[in-house]
Regions:
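Conserved GNAT-fold acetyl-CoA-binding loop/helix
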Residues: 27-48
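Juxtamembrane/interface motifs at transmembrane-helix termini
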Residues: 41-45, 54, 88-91
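Acyl-donor (CoA/ACP) binding surface of acyl/acetyltransferases
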Residues: 1-28, 60-170
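A short helix-loop-beta-strand connector motif used in the catalytic cores of GNAT acetyltransferases and
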Residues: 48-61, 70
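Short linear motifs in intrinsically disordered
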Residues: 15-17, 47-50
Length: 170
């Protein structure tokens, strides 16, 4: 059963049945670089993640292909949670991220108590930057976070973005 659907794209509640696809996505180096996180968990530990802690965690399905193409999840911040997105490697650069993000925000703002959603990405992640712009996120430079790159050990900055309910519907 889908939480929300539009044309051929649908979002369903994430379950542990989705863990294997998500785990494979985390094995992808580009995924790890996109999150500045070297992923080295074994599958059995990954499957023990308490998915009920998160207010919104969905699997993205292309209904025409009858395939899972990615995942979106809200972080745990109670006021401005971060919306994270993972499009599986074989489905990238096909517009799924933009469409799924818009659909997720529509659902979140209609059904959850948030007035603003945050997002972040790194300046070298051109696809995510383009997606955030297309969806309507605005830069929030005052919220940028300096970090150490987990791959190069050089300084980097996670760029901060946000979108309000009014901005999405405006």
């Amino acid at each position: 059963m889908y939480l929300i659907e539009e044309d051929d794209l649908a979002l369903a509640q994430y379950t542990h049945d989705d863990d294997h696809d998500m785990y494979l996505c985390w094995q992808d180096e580009q995924t790890q670089k996109g999150y500045n996180y070297v992923f080295d968990q074994p599958l059995e530990r990954f499957k023990k993640t308490d998915i009920t802690r998160f207010p919104f965690w969905v699997t993205v399905t292309d209904r025409t292909l009858d395939q899972r193409v990615g995942v979106l999840r809200l972080g745990l911040d109670e006021k401005h949670p971060d919306l994270a997105i993972w499009i599986y490697p074989q489905h990238r650069s096909k517009g799924y991220g933009t469409r799924a993000c818009r659909l997720a925000l529509k659902f979140i703002f209609q059904h959850l108590p948030y007035q603003e959603i945050a997002a972040g990405c790194y300046c070298d992640n051109k696809h995510s930057l383009a997606m955030l712009e297309k969806v309507g996120f605005s830069r929030r430079p005052e919220e940028d976070e300096p970090e150490i790159n987990g791959f190069t050990v050089e300084k980097t900055i996670q760029l901060a973005f946000g979108i309000s309910k009014a901005e999405l519907n405006g």
